[in-house]
Amino acid sequence: MQLNPSEISELLKSRIEGLGASTDVRTQGTVVSVTDGITRIHGLSDVMQGEMLEFPNNVFGLALNLERDSVGAVILGDYTGVSEGDQVKTTGRILEVPVGPELRGRVVNTLGLPIDGKGPINTKETDIIEKVAPGVIARRSVSQPLQTGIKAIDSMVPIGRGQRELIIGDRQTGKTAVAVDTIISQKGKGVTCVYVAIGQKASTINNVVRKLEEHGAMEYTIVVAASASDSAAMQYLAAYAGCTMGEYFRDRGEDALIIYDDLTKQAWAYRQVSLLLRRPPGREAYPGDVFYLHSRLLERAARVNEEYVEKFTNGAVKGKTGSLTALPIIETQAGDVSAFVPTNVISITDGQIFLETDLFNAGVRPAINAGISVSRVGGAAQTKVVKKLSGGIRTDLAQYRELAAFAQFASDLDDATRRQLERGKRVVELLKQPQYQPLQVWELAVSLYTVNNGYLDDVDVAQVLSFEKSLKDQLKAKHAALIQRIEDTKELSKDDEAELAAAVQDFKKHGAF
């Protein structure tokens, strides 16, 4: 076959054009050392802070320390397969996790991979785990209630959608129980829940998942689990991964609730990572940015306005506000709320629910100390009927605690003091509540109404809870319309109040409890 010179050049041109070669420029480095999930890498000159790094055998890491001649990175997952001399590549991406409604009902790890043995999760989107919180202009004030179903909280420390309310207390005081009851209480209310378990035993996490399944709560809940056996890096990042999953719903005009159980263990994990990366330690050996660790996480919980949602969804969702409510949990040591991490988180959040060991051991469960528990913004979000009826509860309790201390020394008490003490005992008894039994609004309203109007004053303290239960059973049987009106309107009109008063009086005369 004869080709003249001009044809040769044309043929070469067409061949070169048809190659379609693409260049993938990526910096490559070498592992210098690996210790406890921390690796030092030489040669990654243009790596970004927080960038994902690719190790051999499909292992990924996260660049955290950018030094002059090396990079300090944490390995996500099993680090035993990484050794000195391995080649590491930059990916040009920061850490992302899968997001979307497909995650509901599943248990995933920090990276969003399923660990519940129910097969793969077919999510359509991913999102970065470190995001900037919505600005002041994008936010709406907290004005919608988030019912926990717990009498003591909904009446005295109300929580609103978009609020950050800290649950703080020693170990074994019922912190997780409050959080789980709150999740169960969201059934049928259109709230997607995210439960982030950090540094807990796998058996404990399994118990929580089982309880949520038993009460039909897993269908609207995502569980992000970083157990005690996971690496410190996975434990420290789990909260951010869970927050991103919750933000997916907030940004689309829906309501979400996220529980971090608990941020003390996350701070421990971050301290461990920081010390291994040779960052200078500060107070209690925590690194200097441990406040920022929690503030940038908790500031992402917010109620965003209609304009933010409309802009985010490119006009697909209009006229809807979205919210992400956060309930971080902090474990104290011997009731010391003035330690470093507790004071940090108290200053970041919009209030705290303080659980006390002494109350818990005395049988007051949930063991909420009403004196120092506070909700800074939830009052504006409280339902009208509960707000109307719960005004006297906190005062009664505060006076009771004060008088009870004096009554130990005084033998003869005047009638007014004795009445206040008796009322206080009944309030304390009424606020007790079994686990996994969150109340509806009408049930809370009836309980508050009976104690406020003195209907419990002549009921024996030991019979207060059985009186409450029997009364509600009778109301369900004979006054279903009244219950429905209170539940629908969240108000107690004069006519409804008169009907409720007559029903309670009738029950006291003829009811058995």
Swiss-Prot record:
Classification via PROSITE patterns: ATPASE_ALPHA_BETA
A molecular function (GO) term: proton-transporting ATP synthase activity, rotational mechanism
Keywords: ATP synthesis, ATP-binding, Cell inner membrane, Cell membrane, CF(1), Hydrogen ion transport, Ion transport, Membrane, Nucleotide-binding, Translocase, Transport
One Pfam family cited in the UniProt record for this chain: ATP-synt_ab
Statement: the UniProt record of this protein carries the keyword Ion transport: yes
GO cellular component, one term: plasma membrane
Protein's UniProt keywords contain Manganese: no
Domain of life: Bacteria
Enzyme Commission number: 7.1.2.2
InterPro entries assigned to the protein according to its UniProt record, in alphabetical order: ATP_synth_asu-like_sf, ATP_synth_asu_C, ATP_synth_asu_C_sf, ATP_synth_F1_a_nt-bd_dom, ATP_synth_F1_asu, ATPase_a/bsu_AS, ATPase_F1/V1/A1_a/bsu_N, ATPase_F1/V1/A1_a/bsu_N_sf
Coiled-coil stretches: none
Residue numbers binding ATP: G169, D170, R171, Q172, T173, G174, K175, T176
Catalyzed reactions per annotation: ATP + H2O + 4 H(+)(in) = ADP + phosphate + 5 H(+)(out)
Topology of the protein relative to the lipid bilayer: Peripheral membrane protein
Subcellular location(s) of the protein: Cell inner membrane
Site positions per UniProt: Required for activity: S373
Family: Belongs to the ATPase alpha/beta chains family.
The protein's role, per its UniProt record: Produces ATP from ADP in the presence of a proton gradient across the membrane. The alpha chain is a regulatory subunit.
Complexes and interactors: F-type ATPases have 2 components, CF(1) - the catalytic core - and CF(0) - the membrane proton channel. CF(1) has five subunits: alpha(3), beta(3), gamma(1), delta(1), epsilon(1). CF(0) has three main subunits: a(1), b(2) and c(9-12). The alpha and beta chains form an alternating ring which encloses part of the gamma chain. CF(1) is attached to CF(0) by a central stalk formed by the gamma and epsilon chains, while a peripheral stalk is formed by the delta and b chains.
NCBIfam families (alphabetical): atpA, PRK13343.1
Descriptive protein name: ATP synthase subunit alpha
Origin species: Bordetella avium (strain 197N)
Taxonomy of the source species: Bacteria, Pseudomonadati, Pseudomonadota, Betaproteobacteria, Burkholderiales
Gene assigned in the entry: atpA
